UniProtKB/Swiss-Prot annotation:
Domain of life of the native organism: Bacteria
SUPFAM superfamilies: P-loop containing nucleoside triphosphate hydrolases (SSF52540), RecA protein, C-terminal domain (SSF54752)
Protein name (record): Protein RecA
GO biological process, one term: SOS response
Localization terms from the record: Cytoplasm
InterPro entries: AAA+_ATPase, DNA_recomb/repair_RecA, DNA_recomb/repair_RecA_CS, P-loop_NTPase, RecA-like_C, RecA-like_N, RecA_ATP-bd, RecA_C_sf
Family that this chain belongs to: Belongs to the RecA family.
Source organism of this protein record: Neisseria lactamica
């Protein structure tokens, strides 16, 4: 298909799905995760990757969207998802056996046109069939990278046509022998880095404590890549155990930053009210 961009083809505003974090929506520059695009969320273990995705799923469902969760890690917790506001009974869940099966399911869901958001958790768990059927200790160099490269070539066109948001969760690995620069890299080769319109680096920066009891994590998200707005912005928010992103805490922090709320010591005041 070929078209001339002379105005006859109506240019529409970019549709987005909120992340559930006000600060992160602002950092993304467009108000959320862009539809019709691929998004990669990566970070260390227990940094809040799945929580952030489930928060976005809950926001999508709130606006009448249909969501699917491809759980390659076989670790989906419906009780926790429900606490974050996910309507579990309306969520399509798949727990595939192989990487090929997971990506085929993802492609089928996208091509159907009936799904608004697909989450793949995680790229590291997309094990090629040859590796599953082989013996422990067998060498399968580059198999997963080749699988991801082929799948993304197929997926990217369908994602644009159906205006579906596809989020890939990814893990971090260390490169051996790196003297300069960061030794960290993500799994599954380089293809996902190229095909992603947005890449988010999520890190746990500290703990939220009440006395000795740990109530949650302080979290920082950096927008490492952004094709729809300026990149390298960042957002900080709290993730409370069993509750998810602390919306009230984030609202107060943004209010203080923009001089809407006054802070003096441990007190916050707005229009004279403390």
């Amino acid at each position: 298909a070929i078209m001339k961009m002379d105005g006859s083809q109506q240019e529409e505003n970019l549709e987005v799905i909120s992340t559930g974090s006000l600060g992160l929506d602002l950092a993304l520059g467009v108000g959320g995760l862009p539809r019709g695009r691929i998004v990669e969320i990566f970070g260390p273990e227990s940094s809040g990757k799945t929580t952030l995705c489930l928060e976005a799923v809950a926001q999508c469902q709130k606006n009448g969207g249909v969501c699917a969760f491809v759980d390659a890690e076989h670790a989906f917790d419906p009780v926790y998802a429900r606490k974050l506001g996910v309507k579990v009974e309306e969520l399509y869940l798949s727990q595939p056996d192989t990487g090929e099966q997971a990506l085929e399911i993802c492609d089928t869901l996208v091509r159907s046109g009936g799904i608004d958001m697909v989450v793949v958790d995680s790229v590291a768990a997309l094990v090629p069939k040859a590796e599953i059927e082989g013996d422990m200790g067998d060498s399968h160099v580059g198999l997963q990278a080749r699988l991801m490269s082929q799948a993304l070539r197929k997926l990217t066109g369908h994602i644009k046509k159906t205006n579906t948001l596809v989020v890939f969760i990814n893990q971090i690995r260390m490169k051996i022998g790196v003297m300069f620069g960061s030794p960290e890299t993500t799994t599954g080769g380089n293809a996902l880095k190229f095909y992603s319109s947005v890449r988010l680096d999520i890190r746990r920066t500290g703990s939220i404590k009440k006395g000795e009891e740990v109530l949650g994590n302080e979290t920082r998200v950096k927008v490492i890549k952004n094709k729809v707005a300026p990149p390298f912005r960042q957002a900080e928010f709290d993730i409370l155990y069993g509750e998810g992103i602390s919306w009230e805490g984030e609202l107060i922090d943004i209010g203080v930053k923009n001089d809407i709320i006054n802070k003096s010591g441990a007190w916050y005041s707005y229009n004279g009210a403390k």
